[in-house]
Every structure is written in structure tokens, then in C-alpha cells.
């Protein structure tokens, strides 16, 4: 009986939209992390007045900061869409009490909880940039921290702790 539900879930049009939007969000966050780390390395090089090969081949700090915040904004948008689609999709499924995977799709599922935590982190990052004027190193560090949480959601939580997202 569980295989029937699994097949229905994987064949749902909501599945493709949910997964693709979340993967695009996580890819955007990965790009933001790389840009953030690049920003931090370039900042360190400039502060030490050691302008080597690394400096000559990179855009300015201002452009890196701009690229970082844009990657975060795009990722946040797709993360929001993916989470909303997941909620709508779950609410439309007619859950029979026999499938524990469907029963586990609540906020108590570690993967869902951490995905919402990622949304809070990146929401704060966008808020801090727009309302509090945070730029540069602060945003770069937040991008790096946020992506570390994304990786946490994929590796240990995705493989060992969640039950509803294992297909």
C-alpha cells in the first residue's frame, strides 16, 4: 500500500514544481556562498595590502556584494515558492493513516524544520540588507552560514533523520 502512495506522490505535478524550485533555490544559495567567500578573501587581501593574482582577476567588492545579494534574493524567492508548493501539495493529498511517510510531513520532520530555518536565515539576510543597511562582510558571512545550514539539510538530515522525504 505504501508503494501506491509513493508512486502517486512522485507522479504528481506538484512534485516537479516543489523539487525544481527548491533545487534552484539551493543552487542560488550555493552561488551566493561562493560569492560571499570570494568577497571575504578579497577583502582580506585588500586589507593586508597584498594585491596579488587573486585581486587582479576579480570584480570589485561592491560588485561582489551586489551579486551576493541578488543571488540571495533569487534563492529566497524560489525557496518561498518551494515551501508554499509543499504546503499546498500536502494539504491536497488525501492522507490515509497507513503511510507513515505522509503522516510525517509536518513541522516536526527535521528536513521541513531546517528548510523553514533556512527561510528565516535568508529572510533575515534580506531584511538586514534592505532595512538595516548591512552590506559586505556581514552579508558574506550570513551567506556562508546559510549555505552551511542548507548542506546540513541535505547530508545528515536528508539521509539519516527524515522519514517523509526519502523516496
What annotation goes with each model-predicted range?
Residues 1-5:
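Short, small-residue-biased leader/transition segments that mark boundaries at the very start
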Residues 6-13, 93-103, 163-166:
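Membrane-interface helix termini and inter-helical loops of multi-pass transporters
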Residues 8-25, 62-69, 101-113:
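Short aromatic-rich membrane-water interface segments that cap or initiate transmembrane helices
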Residues 21-39, 115-126:
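Hydrophobic cores of alpha-helical transmembrane segments in multi-pass inner/ER membrane proteins
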Residues 46-62:
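Juxtamembrane inter-helical linkers in multi-pass membrane proteins
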Residues 75-93:
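Alpha-helical transmembrane segments and their membrane-interface junctions
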Residues 127-149:
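Interfacial loop-to-transmembrane junctions
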Residues 152-167:
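Juxtamembrane boundary at the C-terminal end of a transmembrane helix
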